């Protein structure tokens, strides 16, 4: 899968002052935005190629529905992120097991890192194009660790070369608790250090697919 989420900040920098996204009725595409909603940080981006709606709901809830094609990623969480126990529940329904995943997603600086803790994914395994870095057992499952280098790609600091870290759950689930510090420590032990935290969200991500998701972040903002 194209790592379209790395485009997020570059594309939302222009739209960050928009506040809570509203549906563009003419194009049926929710505008890109970042901000705060009911105490939670949220981030939303799509490339505009798929009819898609992202909706911030009460508390830590959000929903997203996409129809076909295009790249999109969004969700609610914290800015900055941290070693945190994240409780979440979701109805995550990619059509026909299509290319999508439900993930904890975030960035750090010094070093500049984009990271994923993937709880569920469709037919495409996002670790398939990365280098394996071992595995850990956590939260009742094996998580396989991967690393890749993104060369001169969009990031939270503009176009940069940076590392991308993955922890991919082998027994998929759509609700539970993720202790992010467990994965930060596992990555560090594998020679993959985490830096100073930027944002961290419980995200829905999709590429050239269709589906819907309703997600509740239960951990307080």
Swiss-Prot record:
Q: Which Pfam families match?
A: Glyco_hydro_11
Q: Tell me which residues make up the GH11 domain.
A: 28-218
Question: Where do the catalytic residues lie?
Answer: 114 (nucleophile), 205 (proton donor)
Taxonomically, which superkingdom?
A: Eukaryota
Q: In which pathway does it act?
A: Glycan degradation; xylan degradation
InterPro entries given in the database record: ConA-like_dom_sf, GH11/12, GH11_AS_1, GH11_dom, Glyco_hydro_11
Protein keywords: Carbohydrate metabolism, Glycoprotein, Glycosidase, Hydrolase, Polysaccharide degradation, Signal, Xylan degradation
Q: Secretion signal: which residues?
A: 1-19
> EC number(s)?
3.2.1.8
- Enzymatic reactions: Endohydrolysis of (1->4)-beta-D-xylosidic linkages in xylans
Question: Which residues of this chain are annotated as glycosylation sites?
Answer: 96
Q: Does the keyword Glycoprotein apply?
A: yes
| Positions in coiled-coil regions | none
Biological function: Endo-1,4-beta-xylanase involved in the hydrolysis of xylan, a major structural heterogeneous polysaccharide found in plant biomass representing the second most abundant polysaccharide in the biosphere, after cellulose. May act as an elicitor of plant defense responses in certain plants but does not exhibit any cell death when transiently expressed in N.benthamiana.
Q: Spell out the family assignment given in the record's similarity comment.
A: Belongs to the glycosyl hydrolase 11 (cellulase G) family.
What's the name of the protein?
A: Ethylene-inducing xylanase 4
Q: Which organism is it from?
A: Verticillium dahliae (strain VdLs.17 / ATCC MYA-4575 / FGSC 10137) (Verticillium wilt)
* Source species taxonomy: Eukaryota, Fungi, Dikarya, Ascomycota, Pezizomycotina
